[in-house]
Amino acid sequence: MALPCAFLSAAAAANATSFSSSPESRRCRSVHRVPSRPRPPLAPPARVMGKGNSKRKAANTRLWMRLDRRGGCEMILCDKSFVARRSGLPARDLRVLGPLLSRSPSILAREKAMVINLEFVRAIVTADEVLVLEPLAQEVLPFVEKLRKHFPLKSLDVDDVSTHMHTENQDGELAQDVSCYEVEGANHELPFEFQVLDFALEAVCLSYNSTISDLNRSAIAVLDDLMKSVSTRNLERVRSLKSSLTRLLASVQKVRDEVEHILDDNEAMAHLCTARKTKGQKDLLNTILFPETRLCRTHSSIENSTGIRTCVPSDSDAHILDMLLEAYFKQLDGIRNRIFLVRQYIVDTEDYISIQLDNKRNELLGLQLTLIIASFGIAINTFIAAAFAMNIPHRGYHFVIGVPFGQFVGATSFLCMSIVILLFTYAWRNRLLCT
């Protein structure tokens, strides 16, 4: 079978050209024609993990991003079973990241992993890697970029320092101790899972701050328009703004309550230190297999605030996590207070507008009362004049001054005017009329 032209060498191509010039070769070429190969399909953007090719399983696959502590990153299309096997989590914990329960923020601490579900940040963190759900979403991209920019630099620093640790000199043991401090200093006192949790809380807080700033600017503009003109359109804009603030407040309150719950639960805080447990298991295994090796330890009394930690993780990790969560708890509390301030500003403006509307309504009621009193006086005068006018003598259509008709009309008008004045005086003294 003849090969395609793309795989022929230069000499073979020349021979093929000379062979094709003869009539016999033309007949052979018509017999041995090779059909053109179709173009290969484009490579998929992500690897597909998980067993089964059914439509149901294909529908359950979701996009994940895997990032390890050395900066290795890849996109994976997989189902829950693959994620459960890789992270060591039971299936019930993965339901927290599902579409039904994703609206309830939670931070779950398990034996081998930590599940983070904070608004748009949904991730599974182990001691060595992090799995981020839906990394291409618009609101998740800042968090993903933060991770990708941070951990490659950290891995380079750790690699350089660990290379320095393996160099031998006259003071070998002292050099190992100093390098151990440098490794921990390169990590900024935070284990891998603490750094991911730090970035997740930071991304959520930045999103909240951005949202409340936008709502604050919108509130100022909307309320200014409302004070100028109380219309249906402006009232609808205020109602929509209050609904957005209510949803944001509920979201911030849920995240704040979750952080507060972890701060109050020391056992849950200890379970979050997955790196400490993994490192302790590795150190125990190394001690059993190689008892002659010495662990890099330090007995310095310098506090944690100096930025130096021991190589073997200790209970100070829980203290570091406590300070980290407490800082974000205060930040979330500040965001909640900002929401309360904006809501109070809206409520105060609504109260001011309500006072103005009440004042206008009182003015209208005063005007209505004035018109009613005046109409009452005119109606009485008209009724009396109409009832008794036929019994008053007159000389045709020419009325003469001094006849009973003029006296009667004057007396009736004076009486009605007196009644109107009395009614106005009563309304004025009882503050039924506006000033």
Swiss-Prot record:
Q: Name one GO cellular component term.
A: membrane
Transmembrane regions? 369-389, 408-428
Signal peptide location: none
Q: Which UniProt keywords apply?
A: Ion transport, Magnesium, Membrane, Transmembrane, Transmembrane helix, Transport
Its membrane topology, per UniProt?
Multi-pass membrane protein
Q: Where is this region: Disordered?
A: 19-54
Q: Where in the cell is it found?
A: Membrane
Q: Listed GO molecular functions?
A: magnesium ion transmembrane transporter activity
Q: Does the keyword Amino-acid biosynthesis apply?
A: no
InterPro entries attached here? MRS2-like
- The main location is membrane
Q: Does the keyword Membrane apply?
A: yes
SS bond partners? none
- In terms of superkingdom, the source organism counts as Eukaryota
The function of this protein is: Putative magnesium transporter.
The UniProt entry's sequence similarity note says: Belongs to the CorA metal ion transporter (MIT) (TC 1.A.35.5) family.
What is this protein's name?
Putative magnesium transporter MRS2-H
Q: Can you name the source organism?
A: Oryza sativa subsp. indica
